[in-house]
Amino acid sequence: MIVKPENMTFADKKIRMLIAGFPGIGKTTLALSAPKPLYIDVDLSAERINRDVLNMAEGITQPRDYDELRRDLGIGANDMELQAVKSSLKDFETIVIDTGGKLLTIMGQYGRKNNPKYGQTDGSLSLKGYGWLGKEFQRFLDHCIYELDKHIVIIFHTVEEKDGDDTKLRIKAEGSSRNNVWEVMDLGGFMEMRGNTRTIGFSNCERYFAKGTRGVHGVMPIPELVPGVKNDFLTRLFEQYNAVSAEEAKRAAEDKAKYDAAMEKAKQIIDGLTDADSVNAATAEFKAIDHALTSKKESGNLWNAKTAELGLIYDKVLGKYTPKEKEAE
């Protein structure tokens, strides 16, 4: 359905977020601070996670391969099966994937199994396989967002890479697929310790990639979890993100209404112009119009076109419009 831009609020947008960092930094704990998370343990590493952290999840699943994950989430299901999946997931608001690197690996295995052209003899993906993997990752996110109506948070481990004398930090993922991951994310944060404080950075720097939008940027401290304090950092961040979106939409609607009023007023004035006297009489009122967006430029173009049509020019010496002198024949 086509809608006007000013009517798009994005106030309840489902957010796609990437969390990157070294093992042990607390990525899973942070991811489970999202609203009502379903923890999808693709790494099969839940037994290594502190029980108190696991208890933060509303539910846990450990798919052994991408086929099982597709069934769990209703990917490729018929309408009846998809409705059953949606019903089973109704109590969850966020899908947490741990880890994204392993998700891409089992996706690649699924692709090679179903189409030998996607694989090479050494077991790695072919060029065509990587192309499919990027599209499948996008389809996976779209399904979680648009079909299941969930936020999605994907955890990635980090690896160090040498770039000349510098050491860069990059997400750990199979081949070129890691470059496609960032494109589809709304937020991407890199976790690290600064002194004794855990932080997450949402702005690119010389050491790592990150992504911030809707007022989410820079480095944020992550509160230390203590008894009695709720683990809700991402819940509050998502609320802030959508609140900014709602405020932007509100301002856009107000600006559009102001623009429409300005253009209507300008056209009303211009339609009444017939000669130099009427133009000069209307100039002050025209200049007093309260503009928004591009109304000043657009109405100015209409004014200039009308005065040219009437054969008028602005005389800077006299400070008013006068008939243009006819050229001698």
Ranges and model annotations:
Residues 9, 29-31, 86-88, 143-145, ...:
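A general structural signal for short secondary-structure junctions and capping/turn motifs
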Residues 22, 146-223:
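Phosphate-binding/switch region of NTP-binding enzymes
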Residues 2, 7, 11-84, 88-97, ...:
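Conserved P-loop
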Residues 192-261:
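Eukaryote-biased recognition of electropositive, low-complexity segments
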Residues 9-18, 25, 33-34, 44, ...:
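Interfaces that engage single-stranded nucleic acids at replication/repair/recombination sites
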Residues 71-74, 139-142, 146, 271:
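Surface-exposed alpha-helical segments enriched in charged/polar residues
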Residues 99-180:
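P-loop NTPase motor core
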Residues 48-50, 105-109, 193:
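Active-site-proximal flexible loops/turns
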